[in-house]
Amino acid sequence: MKYKRVFLLVLDSVGVGEASDAEKYGDQGANTLGHIVEKTDLFIPNLKKIGFLNTLNMNEDNEVEAYYTIAKPNNAGKDSLNGHYEMMGIESNITFKTFNDGFPTEILDSIEYITGRRIIGNKCCNNSNDIINELGEKELNYGSLIVYTSADSDLQVAAHEDVIPVSTLHEYCEKIRAITLKEEWRVGRVIARPFTGKVGNFKLSNTGRKDYAVKPPEKTILDNLNENNYNVI
């Protein structure tokens, strides 16, 4: 069968069951889609039509208009970056570091040196809104950088747009990206997280967010398509 176009859509973190190595990361019982379905009625007629919900039990449905399956990852690690690499044809044994107890002093000292700003936060927080509302007032008062991480291999830097302009925050994150490529740290992504608002009602600015990921270690499917004169957007 020949296709004229391929649309690749990624619903990041919408899993349909735990991976075989879930125990290694404390993710036993993970099933984002399944747990959502347990709690609420999803109105997703188009996704349902192509078998999205059928992936939960891999049951057959004659009304489904597409092929569906579950893929088992081979790449090491559990973060988004490794998963995206694998979807694009890169098999990698590289594992990016995670920092569940915060970042080592050496990283923080380096960030303070290259930015000239004090670091606050330095903890693992999976909800960015929580940490900006916890530390946002202090950031406003002192012009500090809120640095934190999540369960993934990332280093997130939050700052209020009225204190540190988005362009400046991006410059900081580019510099941080460079120093966190060291083997002993190897952070998968550095993420700029500007926010706006007033004390008690801070809001993340999605338009100013910018991710600085480690570049793919080799060519991807997209590169191969492009080199063979297929348009890639």
Predicted regions and their residues:
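Active-site nucleophile/metal-coordination loop of metallo-enzymes that catalyze phosphate/sulfate
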Residues: S13-H160, I164-S167, R193, N201
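Structural motif
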Residues: F7, Y85-E86, S144-I146, G188-V190, ...
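Extended, H/D-rich, highly charged conserved domains that either
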Residues: A159-H160, S167-V232
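A general structural signal for short secondary-structure junctions and capping/turn motifs
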Residues: M1, N75-D79, L135-E139, A178-K182, ...
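Beta-strand elements within well-structured catalytic alpha/beta cores of enzymes
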Residues: Y3-G17, M87, L225
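A broad, structural surface signal
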Residues: L8, P45, D109, Y113, ...
